[in-house]
């Protein structure tokens, strides 16, 4: 289980028991800058994900050692070959920025875990880089803990996501709207190759760099395409794009079933792996509202709940634009193929959403009545705005003594007639999610040095399908009116 660290654990492991690879840094020097983390005055390991450390093949006790903490801050070069800041571009709220990059982040390198999967180890809040654009490159403890908490909850919910290995406090005081304790969050992902990475490659290196990046991403994320298409050519890259579309469609469909609002779906926050990244302004809805917006910087609702599939389709169109020269033997052929493929995203998403909602309702996705039941369910959700998590878990535990939720009285008998699989529903619909009011309370207390609420919430949301005795308060939505004024912030 992921827990705050115990300072009494042994710390006498000076030698790094592993070595990181530097595949991305070595293959793409034109997209990276060698860098190191900034020195920190009083670093302390605040939270360590022991299970993830073991999956990576790293001894948790070594990570607790002084050498391990230095590694987690980007200061210990021993296990690494080359730490780098990555360059990328991006559309931010629809506006193209040609040079973004890791303004407060470092890629330490890649490591192959005990499961055989190659993953990045990446820092956030480790100090200024060449991409900082005047910012201080640091992160506050609260946002670092939010990323740890929510990303691990998403993993437990079965959502493709980056994960968090650790949070290290730095001993610095950093200025935001007020003075806050500084921290570094250590993120783990199957890669950090973004739509924005391809945009950057396209404008800085043209077709050759775009092809190399696509081949790297294919080898890393979709290796079966290498076997199917051993030679570079339009079919290889078209199938790569289709795979990315499917991965993103499945991810956003799961967001929509769970009531998750990402909040900042820029192209630099869209990974070709399909993993969810960047939890700064995210939120889980209590009441179902298709117009739900929580991010303080999303003033026009571009990334509201109901827009998320549309925005990801738009982001994927931007990816397709960078790959047009690879899609066909002529420019016109590349454009035609790109448009043809992009036009399929809506159907890919709708199929993924149908499968997700069918699973959530315990229904056979292929049964003739399922589509109608799902359509009626969504219409009732829009009309009555029930608490998303409570409603779905209530259905999962249905019995003859259950009282139909308000507005669902006529729908329930139709649903029961389809013989829903309640056992599988209980493995699909969580008891606990990181509800906004609980997250805010836990983070506020942890920043003040009181860790009990954070530890309790972390334990519940990383085992979300198991009801725990005496934890009823963690199942309930926030106070009346809380969501009407609640706002999230990027933490930058």
Curated annotation (Swiss-Prot):
PANTHER family: PROTEIN ADENYLYLTRANSFERASE SELO, MITOCHONDRIAL. The active site is at residue 268. Disulfide bonds: none annotated. Belongs to the SELO family. ATP binds at residues 101, 103-104, 124, 136-137, 187, 194, 278. The keyword Cell membrane does not apply. This is Protein nucleotidyltransferase YdiU. One of its GO terms (molecular function) is ATP binding. Its EC number is 2.7.7.-, 2.7.7.108. It is an enzyme of class 2 (transferase). Nucleotidyltransferase involved in the post-translational modification of proteins. It can catalyze the addition of adenosine monophosphate (AMP) or uridine monophosphate (UMP) to a protein, resulting in modifications known as AMPylation and UMPylation. It catalyses: L-seryl-[protein] + ATP = 3-O-(5'-adenylyl)-L-seryl-[protein] + diphosphate; L-threonyl-[protein] + ATP = 3-O-(5'-adenylyl)-L-threonyl-[protein] + diphosphate; L-tyrosyl-[protein] + ATP = O-(5'-adenylyl)-L-tyrosyl-[protein] + diphosphate; L-histidyl-[protein] + UTP = N(tele)-(5'-uridylyl)-L-histidyl-[protein] + diphosphate. It comes from Corynebacterium efficiens (strain DSM 44549 / YS-314 / AJ 12310 / JCM 11189 / NBRC 100395). The lineage of its organism: Bacteria, Bacillati, Actinomycetota, Actinomycetes, Mycobacteriales. Its cofactor is Mg(2+); Mn(2+). Mg(2+) binds at residues 269, 278. Keywords: ATP-binding, Magnesium, Manganese, Metal-binding, Nucleotide-binding, Nucleotidyltransferase, Transferase.
């Amino acid at each position: 289980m992921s827990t705050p660290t115990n300072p009494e654990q042994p710390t006498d492991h000076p030698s790094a028991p592993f070595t990181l690879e530097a595949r991305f840094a070595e293959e793409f020097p034109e997209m990276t800058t060698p860098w190191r983390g900034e020195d920190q005055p009083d670093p302390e390991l605040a939270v360590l994900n022991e299970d993830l450390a073991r999956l990576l093949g790293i001894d948790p006790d070594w990570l607790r050692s002084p050498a391990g903490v230095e590694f987690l801050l980007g200061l210990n070069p021993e296990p690494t070959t080359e730490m780098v800041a990555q360059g990328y571009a991006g559309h931010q709220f629809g506006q193209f920025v040609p040079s973004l990059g890791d303004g407060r982040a470092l890629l330490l390198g890649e490591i192959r875990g005990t499961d055989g999967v190659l993953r990045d180890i990446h820092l956030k809040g480790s100090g200024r880089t060449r991409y900082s654009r005047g910012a201080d490159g640091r992160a506050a403890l609260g946002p670092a803990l939010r990323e740890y908490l929510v990303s691990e909850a998403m993993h437990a919910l079965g959502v493709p996501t980056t994960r968090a290995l650790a949070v290290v406090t730095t001993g610095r005081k950093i200025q935001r709207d007020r003075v806050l304790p500084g921290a570094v969050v250590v993120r783990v992902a199957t890669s950090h190759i973004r739509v924005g990475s391809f945009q950057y490659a396209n404008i800085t290196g043209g077709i050759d760099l775009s092809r190399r990046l696509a081949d790297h991403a294919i080898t890393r994320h979709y290796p079966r395409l290498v076997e199917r298409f051993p030679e570079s050519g339009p079919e290889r890259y078209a199938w790569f794009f289709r795979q990315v579309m499917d991965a993103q469609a499945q991810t956003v469909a799961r967001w929509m079933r769970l009531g998750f609002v990402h909040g900042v779906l820029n192209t630099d926050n869209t990974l070709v792996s399909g993993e969810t990244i960047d939890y700064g302004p995210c939120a889980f809805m209590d009441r179902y509202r298709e117009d739900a917006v929580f991010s303080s910087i999303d003033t026009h609702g571009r990334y509201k709940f109901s827009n998320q599939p549309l925005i990801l389709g738009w982001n994927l169109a931007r990816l397709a634009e960078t790959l047009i020269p690879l899609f066909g033997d002529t420019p016109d052929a590349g454009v035609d193929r790109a448009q043809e493929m992009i036009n399929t995203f809506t159907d890919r998403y709708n199929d993924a959403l149908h499968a997700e909602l069918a699973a959530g309702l315990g229904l056979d996705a292929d049964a003739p009545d399922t589509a109608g039941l799902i359509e009626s369910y969504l219409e009732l959700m829009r009309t009555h705005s029930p608490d998303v998590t409570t409603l779905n878990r209530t259905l999962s535990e249905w019995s003859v003594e259950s009282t139909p939720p308000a507005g669902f009285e006529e729908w329930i008998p139709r649903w029961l007639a389809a013989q829903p699989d309640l056992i599988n529903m209980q493995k699909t619909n969580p008891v606990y999610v990181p509800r906004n009011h609980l997250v805010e309370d836990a983070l506020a207390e942890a920043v003040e040095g009181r860790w009990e609420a954070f530890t309790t919430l972390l334990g519940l949301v990383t085992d979300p399908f198991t009801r725990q005795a005496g934890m009823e308060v963690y199942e309930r939505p926030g106070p009346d009116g809380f969501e009407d004024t609640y706002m999230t912030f990027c933490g930058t």
